[in-house]
């Protein structure tokens, strides 16, 4: 899923310093992060029995933790804060109520092909007010994760996911598939806390530096 880094801790420290140096005086961006699934909806299950809902929740919490360490953190809200099933409509309504600058839904992939691997970034295939912004941000996120952080990527794709379709009239929205739980290497990689920390930092770095 990525080019293995010999010293992830050093990279985390380095990018936290870069984030701190790059903070500006503009109004805080409001970000809604949607940890996919939850409760009785476990989502995909990995070869090592890891569940998609748990990966998404752990990753979202790690983004929150890293963000709170910043001198000037973003305003980040989650659609769920524990193992609870929240309806898709309620997730999008929260983003609208908060007047979010960006909606990011976190998921893991699964395939009958055990060799399928890599991240995917989705935007809605429905044309709306924020279609261009969402598409641009999706390509920026893909570029960031792939070239800057070394994650294997399957590119930006378009789909009619409900959380994307229902947010596109009031904010740019993207859905990130973090890798394939059906792939032995990626399932193992995602299950390690240090690696989730690496992914979370990559996401936070993108959120902090992107032009929303």
Report each predicted region and the residues it spans:
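Active-site-adjacent substrate-binding region
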Residues: 132-157
């Amino acid at each position: 899923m990525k080019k293995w880094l010999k010293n992830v801790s050093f990279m985390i420290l380095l990018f936290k310093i870069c984030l701190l140096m790059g903070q500006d005086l503009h109004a805080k961006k409001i970000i809604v992060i949607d940890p996919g699934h939850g409760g009785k909806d476990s989502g995909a299950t990995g070869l090592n029995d890891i569940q998609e809902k748990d990966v998404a929740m752990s990753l979202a919490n790690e983004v929150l933790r890293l963000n709170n360490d910043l001198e000037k953190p973003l305003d980040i809200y989650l659609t769920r804060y524990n193992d609870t099933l929240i309806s898709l409509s309620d997730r999008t309504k929260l983003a609208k109520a908060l007047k979010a600058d960006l909606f990011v839904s976190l998921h893991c992939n699964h395939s009958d092909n055990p060799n399928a691997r890599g991240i995917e970034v989705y935007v809605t295939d429905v044309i709306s007010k924020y279609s261009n912004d969402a598409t641009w941000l999706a390509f920026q996120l893909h570029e960031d994760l792939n070239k800057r952080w070394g994650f294997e990527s399957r590119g930006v794709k378009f789909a009619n996911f409900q959380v994307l379709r229902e947010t596109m009239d009031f904010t740019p929205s993207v859905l990130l598939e973090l890798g394939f739980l059906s792939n032995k290497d990626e399932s193992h990689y995602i299950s390690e806390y240090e690696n989730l920390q690496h992914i979370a930092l990559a996401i936070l770095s993108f959120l902090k530096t992107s032009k929303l």
